[in-house]
Curated annotation (Swiss-Prot):
Keyword Iron: yes
Subcellular location: Cytoplasm
GO annotation, cellular component aspect: cytosol
Keyword flag Oxidoreductase: no
UniProt-annotated stretches for the region Dimerization: 88-149
Signal peptide: none
Domain of life: Bacteria
Name of the protein described by the UniProt record: Ferric uptake regulation protein
Top-level taxonomy: Bacteria, Pseudomonadati, Pseudomonadota, Gammaproteobacteria, Pasteurellales
Quaternary state and interactors: Homodimer.
Function description: Acts as a global negative controlling element, employing Fe(2+) as a cofactor to bind the operator of the repressed genes.
UniProt record similarity statement: Belongs to the Fur family.
Pfam family, one: FUR
Length: 149
């Protein structure tokens, strides 16, 4: 993975540094478990690994990764940015308004309709982001540690 990440960083014009490689590998390692990472999430994971990468460096690297397209930034109804690896373009998000949990989903019909609507307005869809805000139908489905006060 490190060799692939080295090639990736070089291909987007970023210098290969240990913090960049470490943060990218960490996001890849935890992608299934945590699809959306805040800078603080990354920093906590780094601390668990006894890394000496500081929070300011984490913010800087995440912003650089976003600028070159490695990451996508989201602000799911909050001022706190979260990032996800830019590996799966065709998905959207449902955010629970009670607990803040984010679910990713794919729907070919929605993707098709977005392209059609763009074309109806004489445009070609380049990218999109769709956030659906909902409430968990079963409150026990909500993750209590994430509940909003």
């Amino acid at each position: 993975m490190s060799e692939e990440n080295t090639k990736l960083l070089k291909s987007v014009g970023l210098k290969v540094t240990e913090p960049r490689l470490t943060i990218l590998a960490l996001m890849q390692q935890y992608r299934e478990e945590m699809q959306h990472f805040s800078a603080e999430d990354i920093y906590k994971l780094l601390l668990e690994q006894s890394s000496d990468i500081g929070l300011a460096t984490v913010y800087r690297v995440l912003n650089q990764f976003e600028e070159v397209g490695i990451l996508l930034r989201h602000n799911f109804d909050s001022n706190k940015a979260v990032f996800e690896l830019n590996v799966d373009h065709e998905h959207d998000h449902i955010i629970c308004m009670d607990c803040g949990k984010v679910f990713e989903f794919k729907d070919p019909d929605i993707e098709r309709r977005q392209r059609e609507i763009s074309e109806q307005h004489g445009m070609k869809l380049a990218t999109h982001s769709l956030y659906l805000y909902a409430k968990c139908s079963d409150i026990s489905h909500c993750d209590s540690k994430d509940k909003k006060d």
